[in-house]
Every structure is written in structure tokens, then in C-alpha cells.
């Protein structure tokens, strides 16, 4: 009897596996068919023969989650850019200007093997790129350019998967999921009527659902180029970009030139995680521009900073001070500065945040309802074991309406984030709007 049941069960499982295999095969083949139709719609042989693309753009940015205020309406800023790519030789170039959040920029990136540079025209510097990565650098440009995205999808069709049909705003779409070389998986929506890529989306860690919208296609030398691109973060408009000019298979020589008047400065090496004891019982731990400060208060640790990587920084701290983290201070509400909320939450620490940022902090937590929070409206003071930490809201600033800093008066140490920035090396760039403002 047991043998009979086992054989019957084996037969059922085998049938299930065959059905599952057939379904997977069907969805893979359907994805290939959708991709083939999309390639033809976006230029066919012309698209397959695409070697270089140069795109000049103008954009309006809506700083979702990155504005001076924690709620809409979001701050607006403008930018202009030139992006150029050589698919055969793995070359990518970006140059552009931007302003927003109290900062202004005019710079660029050249990824070209050993001749790769980070350019800062405001500072007048050119820094070699230590580890040039074509896929990572060009990825954002590829994701917002349907011709390149469809080309990439064709090249990676073996990992594409048909997700089904969707109707959005009365329009029917074939939906295909796939992964690029780097970054989260992408879901692409192709119009069932003309097979054009109209939308895509992916989940971006720390930000949530990001959506791409492609409008107003024109043919440029036989290749479909969208004239308008819109970007959304969790449904909120984040970027509206218009293409001013596009060139297909044009040489990139002029874009590869590094201006002779730029000062060559040393290569900017990746900054590994390091721990520095900047004063007795005060540690600065971090790397690559993201740091947290930890202060020994006797029976507990006070921590300042909420960027990504807080768990690794706490782990490093435990090597020299195995004490509970009682407080974790967030400098401000921007999404890249609340990524550490869950780490402090897991430690059982009480979060210190500006009163206006409490809602954002709770939304960033695993369980916002039980998150322990101490809000600051002007300033507060922690005193323990003969040590003082003053937490001060220095807002409003050009970057955010409320910005907490941690000040250790006896040690003369101040911890801040995004109030001002300094170059890695070379000359100090001209002042930006956040620099000349004084606070008392």
C-alpha cells in the first residue's frame, strides 16, 4: 500500500513539475516574442546597429523626500545635461549643471577605461576614477532611455520573464520583468497596439516604488527616441525631462576631452569602513562619505547619524565599546538620512529627531507605532559620566528647514550632515547658497 501511494505521489509530483516547467517555458517564450516586437517597433535593424547615442536634456526636479520641508509641495530645481554612450567600447560620459537643497553643481563623469575622470568645473578639478564601472555609471542613462533599455532587454532576454497583461488608464500592456547587470529588477510595460515601451518600474531600496514614463516618441535616424520622460517616487512626480537634441551613431571624441584648464588631482579611492577615535570615548565610524559618531556616555552610547550602514558601524563600535546604544540622533528627514532608523529600532534605542520629522522617522521604522522617539524643537542636552552632548536644531538652512547637529563643547567636536561639503582634494570650490549664511 505504501509503495502504491508513493508511486502515485511521485506521479502527481512529476506531473506538477512538468506543468510548472511548461508554464515557465511558455512565459519565457512569450517574453522573447514581446521583446522581438519591441525591438522592431523601436527601430529594428537600426536599433540593433546602434553604437553610440548622444542626448542633450533639460529637466525639472521635484525633490520628493529630499526637500527643505518634510511634506509637499516639494522643492523644484532645474538641470541641464549631456549624456553620451558608446555601447561597443563601454564608454559613458555625463556632463551637467544642477542646483537644489542649498547646493550647486557643474561637473561630469567620463568612463573610458584607464582614461576615466570625475570632473568638477566649479572647483576646477579632474580626478581619475579609481575603479571605473561602465555598467554602474551608465545604468541610470540606460534606464531612462527606451532605445537603450530595449537593446539591453534584447541582450538579456534569457533572464526575461513574461508577467502577464495589465490595463492602465484604459490602455493594455504586455508586462515583462528582467534584470540589468546591476541594480534592482525592472518591470517593463509595452503597449499591446504598437509595442512601444511606455512605462517601467522597480523597487529602489530606501525610496520604495520608482516609476518611469516615456512619452512623445520621434524617429531619429530610424530609432525611436522619446522626447519626454517622467519619473515618479511612490506615485509623486520627481522628475520631468525633455530631450533637446539626440544624435545617433555620432563620434564621441569631443565629449571625451578633459579641459586643459582643469587641475589634475589625485585619484579618489574608495573609502573603506574605518573607525577613528577623535577624542577619548568619541568615535567616527564610516566610509565613502557616510559616517556616524558614537559617544561613550558611561553606561550607554549616544549615536549621531542615520544613513545607510548603521548596523556595520555599530558592529565596529562593539569592538571597542560593548555598551547599549541608548539614543540614535537623525540629522534630518531626507530618505538617505533615515535609512538607519531600523538599525536603531533593533537596538532598542530611542530616536532623537526634529519634531517636524517625527512622522518621517516613524514611516521609516519597522513598527512606527512602537518606535521610541524624543523630539527636539530647539535644543536639548544629554549629560552623563561628566560628558555633555548638546543637540541643536540649526534650521532653517538652505538644505532643510530643520537640521540637528550634535555638539560636544568640552571636546570641541560638532557632528553635522549635508550642511556643507568639502572636496576630497584640490582647491575649495566657490561658495554655494548654504555656505555664506551664518547661524547664532
Which residues does each PLM region occupy?
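Flexible, processing/modification-adjacent segments and terminal tails
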Residues: 26-33, 110-185, 194, 204-208, ...
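Bacterial N-terminal signal peptides
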Residues: 8-16
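N-terminal mature ectodomain segment of secretory-pathway/periplasmic proteins
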Residues: 37-124, 159, 164
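Gly/Pro-enriched, hydrophobic low-complexity segments
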Residues: 169-257, 407-409, 416-417, 422-423, ...
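Active-site metal-binding motif and surrounding structural segment of the metallo-beta-lactamase
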Residues: 308-352
Amino acid at each position: 500500500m505504501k509503495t502504491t501511494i508513493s508511486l502515485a505521489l511521485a506521479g502527481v509530483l512529476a506531473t506538477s513539475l512538468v506543468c510548472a516547467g511548461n508554464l515557465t517555458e511558455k512565459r519565457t517564450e512569450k517574453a522573447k516574442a514581446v521583446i522581438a516586437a519591441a525591438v522592431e517597433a523601436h527601430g529594428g535593424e537600426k536599433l540593433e546597429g546602434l553604437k553610440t547615442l548622444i542626448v542633450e536634456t533639460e529637466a525639472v526636479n521635484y525633490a520628493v523626500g529630499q526637500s527643505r520641508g518634510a511634506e509637499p509641495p516639494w522643492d523644484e530645481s532645474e538641470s541641464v545635461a549631456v549624456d553620451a554612450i558608446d555601447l561597443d567600447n563601454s564608454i559613458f560620459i555625463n556632463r551637467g549643471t544642477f542646483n537644489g537643497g542649498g547646493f550647486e553643481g557643474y561637473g561630469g563623469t567620463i568612463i573610458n577605461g584607464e582614461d576615466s575622470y570625475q570632473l568638477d568645473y566649479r572647483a576646477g578639478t579632474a580626478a581619475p576614477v579609481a575603479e571605473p564601472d561602465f555598467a554602474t555609471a551608465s545604468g541610470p542613462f540606460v534606464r531612462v532611455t527606451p532605445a537603450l533599455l530595449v537593446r539591453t532587454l534584447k541582450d538579456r532576454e534569457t533572464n526575461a520573464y513574461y508577467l502577464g497583461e495589465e490595463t492602465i488608464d484604459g490602455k493594455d500592456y504586455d508586462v515583462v520583468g528582467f534584470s540589468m547587470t546591476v541594480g534592482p529588477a525592472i518591470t517593463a510595460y509595452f503597449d499591446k497596439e504598437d509595442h512601444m515601451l511606455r512605462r517601467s518600474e522597480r523597487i529602489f531600496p530606501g525610496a520604495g516604488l520608482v516609476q518611469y514614463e516615456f512619452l512623445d516618441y520621434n524617429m531619429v535616424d530610424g530609432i525611436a527616441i522619446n522626447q519626454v520622460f517622467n519619473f515618479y517616487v511612490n506615485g509623486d512626480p520627481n522628475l520631468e525631462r525633455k530631450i533637446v537634441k539626440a544624435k545617433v551613431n555620432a563620434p564621441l571624441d569631443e565629449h571625451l576631452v578633459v579641459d586643459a584648464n582643469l587641475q589634475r588631482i589625485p585619484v579618489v579611492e574608495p573609502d573603506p569602513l574605518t573607525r577613528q577615535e577623535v577624542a577619548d570615548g568619541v568615535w567616527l565610524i564610516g566610509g565613502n562619505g557616510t559616517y556616524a559618531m558614537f559617544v561613550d556616555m558611561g553606561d550607554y552610547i549616544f549615536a549621531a547619524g542615520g544613513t545607510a550602514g548603521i548596523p556595520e558601524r555599530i558592529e565596529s563600535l562593539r569592538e571597542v565599546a560593548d555598551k547599549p546604544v541608548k539614543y540614535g540622533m537623525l540629522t534630518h528627514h531626507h530618505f538617505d538620512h533615515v535609512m538607519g532608523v531600523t538599525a536603531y529600532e533593533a537596538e532598542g534605542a530611542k530616536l532623537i529627531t526634529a519634531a517636524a520629522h517625527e512622522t518621517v522617522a516613524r514611516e521609516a521604522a519597522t513598527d512606527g507605532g512602537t518606535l521610541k522617539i524624543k523630539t527636539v524643537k530647539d535644543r536639548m542636552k544629554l549629560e552623563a559620566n561628566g560628558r555633555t552632548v548638546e543637540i541643536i536644531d540649526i534650521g532653517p538652512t538652505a538644505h532643510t528647514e530643520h537640521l540637528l547637529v550634535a555638539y560636544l563643547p568640552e571636546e570641541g567636536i560638532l557632528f553635522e550632515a549635508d550642511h556643507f561639503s568639502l572636496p576630497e582634494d584640490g582647491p575649495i570650490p566657490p561658495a554655494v547658497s548654504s555656505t555664506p549664511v551664518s547661524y547664532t
